[in-house]
């Protein structure tokens, strides 16, 4: 998608523009891909909202303890490996669905040996889930 923006003076915050060939107007065409990046960012944000709502629904159903968070993170990791989704589904929906910050917050409330064990189990199982999903997709 190409967007025309008025070019009145050089502005360092906008990408460089060039006039359309032969029309002589003071409008330019954005060459840097600004709009596709904007739409991609908006789609990632919308996807993250969807994923966070799905995670909230599951945590309301199953609780916010250590094991539901681990199951959510493993499921999200498996789906990432299985489908290798693009920005909306991958970074957005599954990024909002998985909750690595929440498992870090939960670790503050448990004794250190349990926290280290849970951290290890989470990282190893999520990597294993991604590898299993990736292998299944091949």
Curated annotation (Swiss-Prot):
<keyword id="KW-0472">Membrane</keyword>
<dbReference type="GO" id="GO:0005886">
    <property type="term" value="C:plasma membrane"/>
</dbReference>
<feature type="transmembrane region" description="Helical">
    <location>
        <begin position="88"/>
        <end position="108"/>
    </location>
</feature>
<dbReference type="GO" id="GO:0046872">
    <property type="term" value="F:metal ion binding"/>
</dbReference>
<keyword id="KW-0813">Transport</keyword>
<keyword id="KW-0915">Sodium</keyword>
<comment type="similarity">
    <text>Belongs to the fluoride channel Fluc/FEX (TC 1.A.43) family.</text>
</comment>
<keyword id="KW-0479">Metal-binding</keyword>
<keyword id="KW-1003">Cell membrane</keyword>
<keyword id="KW-0407">Ion channel</keyword>
<keyword id="KW-0812">Transmembrane</keyword>
<feature type="binding site">
    <location>
        <position position="95"/>
    </location>
    <ligand>
        <name>Na(+)</name>
    </ligand>
</feature>
<protein>
    <recommendedName>
        <fullName>Fluoride-specific ion channel FluC</fullName>
    </recommendedName>
</protein>
<dbReference type="GO" id="GO:0062054">
    <property type="term" value="F:fluoride channel activity"/>
</dbReference>
<dbReference type="InterPro" id="IPR003691">
    <property type="entry name" value="FluC"/>
</dbReference>
<feature type="binding site">
    <location>
        <position position="98"/>
    </location>
    <ligand>
        <name>Na(+)</name>
    </ligand>
</feature>
<dbReference type="GO" id="GO:0140114">
    <property type="term" value="P:cellular detoxification of fluoride"/>
</dbReference>
<keyword id="KW-1133">Transmembrane helix</keyword>
<keyword id="KW-0406">Ion transport</keyword>
<feature type="transmembrane region" description="Helical">
    <location>
        <begin position="60"/>
        <end position="80"/>
    </location>
</feature>
<dbReference type="Pfam" id="PF02537">
    <property type="entry name" value="CRCB"/>
</dbReference>
<feature type="transmembrane region" description="Helical">
    <location>
        <begin position="112"/>
        <end position="132"/>
    </location>
</feature>
<comment type="function">
    <text>Fluoride-specific ion channel. Important for reducing fluoride concentration in the cell, thus reducing its toxicity.</text>
</comment>
<feature type="transmembrane region" description="Helical">
    <location>
        <begin position="34"/>
        <end position="54"/>
    </location>
</feature>
